[in-house]
Amino acid sequence: MARNREGLVLVLDVGPAMRSVLPDVEKACSMLLQKKLIYNKYDEVGIVVFGTEETGNELAREIGGYENVTVLRNIRVVDELAAEHVKQLPRGTVAGDFLDALIVGMDMLIKMYGNAHKGKKRMCLITNAACPTKDPFEGTKDDQVSTIAMKMAAEGIKMESIVMRSNLSGDAHERVIEENDHLLTLFSSNAIAKTVNVDSPLSLLGSLKTRRVAPVTLFRGDLEINPTMKIKVWVYKKVAEERLPTLKMYSDKAPPTDKFAKHEVKVDYDYKVTAESTEVIAPEERIKGFRYGPQVIPISPDQIETLKFKTDKGMKLLGFTEASNILRHYYMKDVNIVVPDPSKEKSVLAVSAIAREMKETNKVAIVRCVWRNGQGNVVVGVLTPNVSERDDTPDSFYFNVLPFAEDVREFPFPSFNKLPSSWKPDEQQQAVADNLVKMLDLAPSAEEEVLKPDLTPNPVLQRFYEYLELKSKSTDATLPPMDGTFKRLMEQDPELSSNNKSIMDTFRGSFEVKENPKLKKASKRLLRDKPSGSDDEDNRMITYDAKENKIDIVGDANPIQDFEAMISRRDKTDWTEKAITQMKNLIMKLVENCTDEGDKALECVLALRKGCVLEQEPKQFNEFLNHLFKLCQERNLSHLLEHFMSKKITLIPKSEAADSDIVDENAGDFIVKQESMLES
């Protein structure tokens, strides 16, 4: 086996207790082999099943025993036939012994590869571990498992145990399960093995690691605390997005008889002064240009190279800060893990000491990183301590890239904290929202968490692999319907929704959505004759469709509609200021030229007040209202003042806008004061 290839033996439980989940096991194993055909087509795979009535394995023929264990496929290069094998697993009729099956699988790997290629040999056990294992001829079961695990460790064989259980009950089952769980734990203690417990088809698909990615260091060098103290560290990728396989251009121009044709497509570009020109510009005559205002600035390759920031590779500690200062949305790219150089004992101790102190004091470290010599860019990141709970695993750090000022996006929105109480959910609405959140909790305290990232496969990738397999068999294959297992990722659990329909209905009824007529009806039909600051639903938050509101001036014809449209715009930050200023100017114009009761001016004042509350601009309205009343008094416009008083227009108090300097009592006193002045 080549150095970069893997030898894998699937050890599958097909006994009666697994019958209900075997279709899911077949699907998971089929997807594993499909990915190997794409990414690791030279890997070698063998298949062993246990729980069958018949026995078919080499150990049984050589020395006897190992009953009800069958080798479906000997270890050889993965192919389409292997994927078909796992889609048609036999349905066993007897309870199988997973220890016997593991010994058969281990024997296959040892005979195939010998003592070479350590770390490239793997067994994957899928079972519910609910059937009893046979007692050994000598010693205890613990001794037997320890012997098997030590042999696996000596041969460099890794093991994954995926335990899938559902609907198991009874004292006998519990005793057997407890014993088998203990035996599987012994494997983890004595060999390179891990056990994953799953309880759904979806988590089974995610638990079977279908693509093998070799750990490659991004960086090996010093973590510099100061010029005289440096710690040797290695940096690996911890979390990185898995993308679709690269689709390459394919040419069918090669003769069908040419077995060595590569079917490659090569693309060449020619650069010309004009499309009609026949003269091709040579590469040395081309130069890059960058726009700077209306002009294009030419910069040669030599100048670009000179501008590049070049520095020596390394990680330098800049300082420590409170973990709460680094917000979650600052994390920009893939997550790396920084581990001490395993060959340097002092590095392990130094990293452990720093990580544990950081965790105890709730601190994180800010570091400057250059991964390679001559790298064109420098990153600043945060180191978060990762204190290990296992004695055989050293402490480490998680590394996340942080943004620079140019990378941060700011979007201006009014703060919900400053909204008046009438626009916030009441106690009953808050209670039904709390119930909705509890109903949809993916990690209830008494149950296992649903949709764990480690056990949740990407449905887009799985869909692609499934379709690729179909196309390999028939070029006319159509895309099949979405698999029911993956629908649970794309849609809410229907059982959960149906069982909690009353909570859903209560929430929907508490937050009834009504059509807002303010953008469709004339302004005079919108405003009701009621006191400002009323808790009526007309005072609720108004939402606008920004695509329909491109008004940029408060006109005389429909001033209220224009005003509301302008303050709803979010394409620039100054629309609110412009709308308020223009509305104030219009009101002053209406008052100065008033020949009637001033209904239109009153409607505009009411609209201005609502807009200033919505945009949290109380000072602008309060100052304007005082100025407006003084103007009416100076010009003896008593009929206007009486009309305004009848509508109880008040200043905006703190209860409606947190930035206001007016308390609620003074807002009411304003009306009384104006009425007394009017009477005098």
Curated annotation (Swiss-Prot):
Transmembrane segments: none annotated. It is found in: Nucleus; Cytoplasm. GO terms for biological process: DNA integration; DNA recombination; DNA repair; double-strand break repair; double-strand break repair via nonhomologous end joining; response to heat; telomere maintenance. Disruption phenotype: No visible phenotype when grown under normal conditions. Hypersensitivity to ionising radiation (IR) and to DNA-damaging agents. Longer telomeres. Defective in T-DNA integration. Belongs to the ku80 family. Keywords: ATP-binding, Cytoplasm, DNA damage, DNA recombination, DNA repair, DNA-binding, Helicase, Hydrolase, Nucleotide-binding, Nucleus. Residues 224-432 form the Ku domain. Its main location: nucleus. The gene is KU80. This is ATP-dependent DNA helicase 2 subunit KU80. Induction: Up-regulated in response to induction of double-strand breaks. Down-regulated by heat shock. The lineage of its organism: Eukaryota, Viridiplantae, Streptophyta, Embryophyta, Tracheophyta. One of its GO terms (cellular component) is cytoplasm. Pfam families: Ku, Ku_C, Ku_N, Ku_PK_bind. Expressed ubiquitously. Its EC number is 3.6.4.12. InterPro entries: Ku70/Ku80_beta-barrel_dom, Ku80, Ku_C, Ku_C_sf, Ku_N, Ku_PK_bind, SPOC-like_C_dom_sf, vWFA_dom_sf. It comes from Arabidopsis thaliana. It catalyses: ATP + H2O = ADP + phosphate + H(+). Heterodimer with KU70. Interacts with WEX. Single-stranded DNA-dependent ATP-dependent helicase. Involved in DNA non-homologous end joining (NHEJ) required for double-strand break repair. When associated with KU70, binds to double-stranded telomeric and non-telomeric DNA sequences, but not to single-stranded DNA. Plays a role in maintaining telomere length. Acts as a negative regulator of telomerase. Binds to and recombines double-stranded T-DNA molecules. One of its GO terms (molecular function) is telomeric DNA binding.
